[in-house]
Amino acid sequence: MPTLRSLLAGLWLLASGLLVSTTALAAEDDRPVVNDSGVAPEKPAAGTLPTLWIAGDSTVKSNAPMRGWGQDLGQFFDPKKINVVNHAIGGRSSRTFYTEGRWQKLLDGVKPGDWVIIQFGHNDVGATGASSKFRGSVKGIGDNTETVTKEDGKTEVVQSYGWYLKTMARTARAKGANVILCSPIPHKKFDSAGKPARDWSDFRGWVQTCAKETGAYYVDLCELIARDYDKLKQPEIEAMFADKGTHTNDAGSRFNARALVAG
């Protein structure tokens, strides 16, 4: 697997005119409900250029006062050389992004040579049924499934987190795109010494394995951001969040986008 810096160097080659210099989960589903169902997917500004597509949840795209890193990634690239198109939408898991047809809409626009960045997990952690608003995916990366009955009486066969990620990666690569699978961004959590705590241990391993099995690139975005948090004091980190500990504000989204680009 290529190093992180060599991977990002490939992105810089696509956007050689870089504009900006880069210097334990809750047992119950108490996250705020973010539902951007009415938000239309973005479209490339210039269809003939290479496109960097982004798929994710509200930590990648959301509305003020919350803001996801995908909304700030475009500032690091020259719009005359590459499109940056954010299809991420609040309230979605890998499961619901796929089953609602949002992945297919993104995939329809992908052409050979494009890049696709995918980050899910924050809405995959809950149960597969009503208690988590039918958003959770089956834990793991295997072929195990769960069948749930929806509120309308219809049944759904829910696949694993890894199944959805691998399906997205494989279908994008089949169209000639380069795929990057990212671990979820960290929560606002601290250890007993007040240092940023690492979380997502299971999910980070699952994403890495999915990348390996599909030929996608893997970026441990959780660790990249946490390393940069290590350089800050706790109040400085807390100031970059818009809620209890999941969603960033505009300062936090810029911080996370810079961490991704800087590597």
Language-model features: locations:
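N-terminal secretory signal peptides that target proteins for export/translocation
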Residues: 1-4
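Bacterial N-terminal signal peptides
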Residues: 9-21
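Sec/Tat signal peptide C-region and signal peptidase I cleavage site
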Residues: 22-26
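Serine-esterase "nucleophile elbow" of acetyl-processing enzymes
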Residues: 27-90, 104-116, 132-140
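A generic structural signal for short coil/turn motifs at secondary-structure boundaries
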Residues: 61-64, 94-96, 189-191
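Residues at alpha-helix caps and immediate loop-helix transition turns in enzyme cores, especially N-
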Residues: 65-66, 98-99, 252
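N-terminal post-signal-peptidase region of extra-cytosolic proteins
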Residues: 93-105
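Alpha-helical cap/lid subdomain in secreted, periplasmic
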Residues: 102-250, 254, 258-263
